Amino acid sequence: MTSIAFCNAFTVNPFLAAARRSPPPLTPLTSVALSPARKPRILAIFHPRTFPSFRVQAIAEDEWESEKKTLKGVVGSVALAEDEKTGADLVVSDLKKKLIDQLFGTDRGLKATSETRAEVNELITQLEAKNPNPAPTEALSLLNGKWILAYTSFVGLFPLLGAESLQQLLKVDEISQTIDSEGFTVQNSVRFVGPFSSTSVTTNAKFEVRSPKRVQIKFEEGIIGTPQLTDSIVIPDKVEFFGQNIDLSPFKGVISSLQDTASSVAKTISSQPPIKFPISNSNAQSWLLTTYLDDELRISRADGGSVFVLILESSPLLT
């Protein structure tokens, strides 16, 4: 009994027993033996549920090619639109540069030749055709700010710009238009400068939107600014008179006295309030049509088709 118990404690290894069995008889190559499928034993080291499951969906090749073509078409359309936008911006930028070059030396159009006027009108027409804001009154914020007049075909301004008798005393230094879209106000201003003073004439107006491009302007008052006198007179140390140099240094005491007097007079006059007067005649209204507008350039047309080219005060186009 003791020997039997001892043997039962160490059972025979089944793998060794299988290895000791005689091999099965060889099957001839000319015959095929079919045996029933046996279910293989699998040694499970990990639980099968710990492995994630994946699903693979098969797509027909034609369908995949169609999707690739669609995606390629969308990407191509976006790239083409970006290229077209970049190209259009370059064209507009080039047109503006050419326009500014043509305006150089024309004194706001006063000294422009007929050939220059024709070229300017052609460039203006091309810019109007590429207006990035075809409805300017719907983008009133772009109208805000001080706009400097660079060119006009309005003949009513030419006598003011070209009067020789006036230029001997005063010269037109700047013509501007300031727009406040929140208050619906327009201020037109002409600034004059002279040898010893400067002044300005201003008109204040209200405007109403009448169409996507047109506004109606009603002038309310005019203002004549108080002259700002130069408070110092600069006298050179010497001057040449009929080929002789005259020393002015002995007169510095007299000159200093004159400068003090001029400074006192200038402060007195400059401290006076401007002169205001109402505008109520039949010519107190006009309309303005904006045919081109971006963040630095504005082209407008007024009664009779007169054209105005204005540049925003902060624009590098003025430099």
Curated annotation (Swiss-Prot):
Keyword entries, A-Z: Chromoplast, Plastid, Transit peptide
GO cellular component: chromoplast
Pfam families in the record: PAP_fibrillin
KW Plastid (keyword) present: yes
Subcellular location(s) per record: Plastid, Chromoplast
First and last residues of the transit peptide: 1-55
Domain of life assignment: Eukaryota
InterPro entries hit by this protein: PAP, PAP/fibrillin_dom
Family under the similarity heading: Belongs to the PAP/fibrillin family.
Function per UniProt: May be involved in carotenoid sequestration within chromoplasts.
Name recorded for this polypeptide: Chromoplast-specific carotenoid-associated protein C2, chromoplastic
Organism the protein comes from: Oncidium hybrid cultivar
Gene that specifies this protein: CHRC2
